Amino acid sequence: MMYHIPGVLSPQDVARFREQLEQAEWVDGRVTTGAQGAQVKNNQQVDTRSTLYAALQNEVLNAVNQHALFFAAALPRTLSTPLFNRYQNNETYGFHVDGAVRSHPQSGWMRTDLSATLFLSDPQSYDGGELVVNDTFGQHRVKLPAGDLVLYPSSSLHCVTPVTRGVRVASFMWIQSMIRDDKKRAMLFELDKNIQSLKSRYGENEEILSLLNLYHNLLREWSEI
């Protein structure tokens, strides 16, 4: 399943990020991809050795960790270190699949269950640059407001179309979920959303408590910690 997570960064945060990224050191984006991806990748990424990068990636991690909808949809166990990319002058990233595992500074290795793109450019400021994701439900084309995030299964083939005008800047990362199976994770998310909706409409009652008990028992049954 694909999820739109709005408002991960405020407009003020986005403006500050963009101002700082104007001063960043950018390198060839192929430095962080495997052999297959390198053949179809043509973009730039912030140099991960820079002091600015260390500060910005920490801010992204803090923002997603504090976002309730992101947590409910992803049920994250491990987040990769966020990266930042830039597309301009017809740069693109052809169809590819993300690696199944990635190195992680704390855990050593992590499984990539979900991929996330946090948009940092106003969609009206550039042409092209759509994230195109192919999954079992068809093809999805994504171009979100700055500060919003899209979450999708890392098993999906995806690409970024050429940016023919302006500049597309984003942060991206991978998530190992507590729930490995996409279908089970989607069911838990739907159950959680409906519990929250019922609570806001009717307040606490025995039926809602019973549903909440069901949610946590399923999470206990399916989670890998």
UniProtKB/Swiss-Prot annotation:
Sorted UniProt keywords: Dioxygenase, Iron, Metal-binding, Oxidoreductase, Vitamin C
PANTHER family linked to this entry: PKHD-TYPE HYDROXYLASE YBIX
GO molecular function, one term: 2-oxoglutarate-dependent dioxygenase activity
Matches recorded under Gene3D superfamilies: q2cbj1_9rhob like domain, Rabenosyn, Rab binding domain
Residues that hold Fe cation according to the record: 96, 98, 158
Keyword Metal-binding: yes
EC number: 1.14.11.-
Cofactor(s) named in the record: Fe(2+); L-ascorbate
Pfam family, one: 2OG-FeII_Oxy_3
SUPFAM superfamilies named among the record's database cross-references: Clavaminate synthase-like (SSF51197)
Protein name: PKHD-type hydroxylase YbiX
